[in-house]
From Swiss-Prot:
Comment on protein domains: The integrity of the zinc-binding domain in NSP1 is important for degradation of host IRF3.
Function of the molecule: Plays a role in the inhibition of host innate immunity by inducing the degradation of key host factors required to activate interferon production such as IRF3, IRF5 or IRF7. Associates with components of cullin RING ligases (CRLs) including CUL1 or CUL3, which are essential multisubunit ubiquitination complexes, to modulate their activities.
Predominant location category: host cell
Protein family membership: Belongs to the rotavirus NSP1 family.
Protein known as: Non-structural protein 1
Record's keyword terms, sorted: Host cytoplasm, Host cytoskeleton, Host-virus interaction, Inhibition of host innate immune response by virus, Inhibition of host IRF3 by virus, Inhibition of host IRF7 by virus, Inhibition of host RLR pathway by virus, Interferon antiviral system evasion, Metal-binding, RNA-binding, Viral immunoevasion
GO molecular function: metal ion binding; RNA binding
């Protein structure tokens, strides 16, 4: 059984490129070239995976063979990093487990050690991109990313940083999915600030883009938004990346995107009862993403994810269509009144009543207080995120 630090190096082995050495059992050695055939669930890297002695699944690379299997619950690391559920866990449950994982990791990973401080120096002034097929980078593994897959009728959740964008399902694991705990920008160790280097957190990859209004195909760069911890005031700075261009996200521009995306959510909610075969603009192939730019879609998921989730849940409760109605049932009066309520709350703080969309006698009228309070809280979170964070070009 490896000791704590050696086990940490097995699990959090990070490499920048093929010319630099990788961390392996307290020593530095060069990366051996081999053909990758899967994702190692220990170092979360694209490797040549081998069968595990404990469970028989091919989920370990050659450098992680001595690490304990994720199914071995007796291991101290596994009890914090790997979580098993019988049913689909909620975001709040995942967040509680993630806090315990973060606290445990910081108690074991000491940046005062020379070997671990060397990892930070190698990461100095480098940005972490999700496109790891071209460039590999070091990153502190305390992020809001998690890996989820189903195996033997159980759901496994693993926290950590992923060094590849080519995660694919394989036969033994049934299904594999990369997710994010909300869109939180996670805490960093205080020792990072002392190095006076610029460190990037996990890049955000939106999965809701299906096409864009351009002749060129969608690339991975269209999904990125970079975040960096500023050493002067310890605040986060953001810049959206579209192609090769970095677009500054100022407070005024962020507020513009917020109002624009509120209208987008209202548009989709207003057409939620329209049948898929009707002549509704929501189902028009030319408006599949509502002519939204990549930056708008990334902004929705990065800064107002709670508002988007509220509209998604509210649509599921109220947006059932009828098969015998093949016409567009969009009601401009109701949506205009709903939009006016939201705008008044944003501008003057007037409480949202939801009386336009949930009239007296509606099936959801008994839960109207919960719905209106949750919407106002979601808007407050988005506005506080816009106001409190300094957003600029990295």
């Amino acid at each position: 059984m490896a000791n704590s630090f050696r086990e940490m190096l097995y699990w959090y082995r990070k490499i920048i490129d093929r010319k630099l050495p990788c961390v392996n059992v307290n020593i530095w050695r060069r990366e051996i070239a081999y053909k990758a055939n899967g994702i190692c669930l220990n170092c979360l890297n694209e490797c040549k995976v081998c069968p595990c002695d404990y469970c028989g699944i091919r989920h370990k690379c050659e450098n992680c063979l001595n690490s304990d299997c994720f199914m071995n619950t007796n291991n101290e690391f596994n009890s914090h990093r790997w979580i098993t559920f019988d049913e689909e866990p909620s975001q709040m449950v995942l967040f509680e487990y993630w806090i315990m994982y973060k606290d445990y990791f910081l108690s074991k990973f000491n940046y005062n050690y020379k070997a671990q401080l060397k990892i930070l120096n190698m990461n100095k002034n480098r940005r972490f991109h999700i496109n790891e097929s071209k460039k590999k980078a070091l990153s502190v593994p305390i992020t809001s990313q998690y890996l989820k897959f189903k195996f033997n009728n159980k759901i496994y959740i693993m926290f950590g940083t992923f060094l590849t964008s080519k995660i694919q399902p394989w036969i033994q694991l049934k299904s594999l999915k990369v997710g994010y705990i909300q869109s939180l920008n996670v805490d960093r160790c205080a020792k990072l600030i002392a190095t006076k280097g610029m460190f990037a957190t996990n890049s955000f990859k939106s999965s809701c883009i299906t096409e864009i209004n351009a002749r060129r195909p969608i690339s991975e760069c269209d999904y990125l938004i970079e975040a960096c911890l500023c050493n002067e005031n310890n605040e986060w700075k953001f810049s959206a990346v579209m192609g090769r261009d970095k677009i500054p996200v100022t407070k005024s521009l962020a507020m513009k995107y917020f109002c624009k995306n509120i209208n987008t959510e209202l548009f989709y909610y207003g057409h939620s009862k329209c049948h898929v075969v009707s002549e509704c603009p929501r189902w028009n192939q030319q408006l599949r993403v509502l002519n939204a730019s990549t930056l708008n879609i990334i902004f929705r998921r990065q800064f107002m994810n709670e508002v988007v989730e509220w509209f998604e849940n509210f649509t599921q409760l109220t947006g059932m269509h009828y098969d015998f109605i093949k016409t567009c049932v969009y009601n401009k009066v109701i949506i205009s009144h709903f939009r006016k309520e939201i705008e008044d709350y944003i501008n003057s703080g007037k409480k949202i009543s939801l009386s336009s969309v949930i009239p007296d006698g509606h099936a959801l009228y008994t839960n109207i207080d919960i719905l209106r309070i949750s919407l106002m809280l979601a808007i407050d979170v988005a506005l506080n995120r816009i106001e409190s964070q300094q957003m600029d070009v990295l």
